[in-house]
């Protein structure tokens, strides 16, 4: 279990992000919460500056950080600042909260590849910032779409969205 790694991503409402990412090969567990804001112990009703985020625990023997990021860029629009679908505000920004320098490098390389690919019509505005405290969201937000499959989401897989292989990719 100690070989597992963490990733923290934000890309709009955390319900849809969690519902899709938790099903990916190599993902061991997920939890939704808040990070990147000004207050301690944020809540759904009080999380100024925090992004709705997902903390992913994954097995690097089964997947890698680059694969998680490529899926992340496939399921949300990284070219809209502080917005996903009908959700508007900094809570819904696109962000990668890296836990070490290697994750930062992979994040920046992946963003460069997404921009170069032309798969999205605009330039990627995803923030890349060091991970701070991750505050777990209230229980009613955990695995929300698993419990309420008819609930709101603005995330969906785009099966034809595939980045070209990078010659020097090391994830």
Curated annotation (Swiss-Prot):
The active site is at residue 13. GO terms for molecular function: L-methionine:thioredoxin-disulfide S-oxidoreductase activity; peptide-methionine (S)-S-oxide reductase activity. InterPro entries: Met_Sox_Rdtase_MsrA_dom, Met_Sox_Rdtase_MsrA_sf. Its EC number is 1.8.4.11. SUPFAM superfamilies: Peptide methionine sulfoxide reductase. The keyword Transcription regulation does not apply. It is an enzyme of class 1 (oxidoreductase). Signal peptide: none annotated. It holds the Pfam family PMSR. It catalyses: L-methionyl-[protein] + [thioredoxin]-disulfide + H2O = L-methionyl-(S)-S-oxide-[protein] + [thioredoxin]-dithiol; [thioredoxin]-disulfide + L-methionine + H2O = L-methionine (S)-S-oxide + [thioredoxin]-dithiol. GO terms for biological process: protein modification process. Keywords: Oxidoreductase. HAMAP family: MsrA. PANTHER family: PEPTIDE METHIONINE SULFOXIDE REDUCTASE, PEPTIDE METHIONINE SULFOXIDE REDUCTASE MSRA 2. Has an important function as a repair enzyme for proteins that have been inactivated by oxidation. Catalyzes the reversible oxidation-reduction of methionine sulfoxide in proteins to methionine. Belongs to the MsrA Met sulfoxide reductase family. This is Peptide methionine sulfoxide reductase MsrA. The lineage of its organism: Bacteria, Bacillati, Actinomycetota, Actinomycetes, Mycobacteriales. The gene is msrA.
């Amino acid at each position: 279990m100690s070989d597992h790694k963490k990733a923290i991503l934000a890309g709009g409402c955390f319900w849809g992000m969690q519902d899709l990412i938790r099903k990916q090969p190599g993902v061991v567990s997920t939890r939704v919460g808040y990070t990147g804001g000004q207050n301690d112990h944020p809540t759904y009703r009080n999380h100024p500056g925090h992004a709705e985020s997902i903390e992913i625990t994954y097995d690097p023997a089964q997947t890698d950080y680059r694969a998680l990021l490529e899926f992340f860029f496939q399921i949300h629009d990284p070219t809209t600042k502080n917005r996903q679908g009908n959700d508007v505000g900094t809570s819904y920004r696109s962000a990668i909260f890296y836990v070490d320098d290697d994750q930062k490098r992979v994040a920046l390389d992946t963003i460069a590849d997404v921009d170069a690919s032309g798969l999205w019509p605009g330039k990627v505005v995803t923030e890349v910032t060091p991970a701070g405290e991750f505050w777990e969201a209230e229980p009613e937000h955990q695995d929300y779409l698993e419990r309420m499959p008819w609930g709101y989401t603005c995330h969906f897989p785009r099966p034809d969205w595939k980045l070209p292989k990078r010659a020097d990719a090391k994830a």
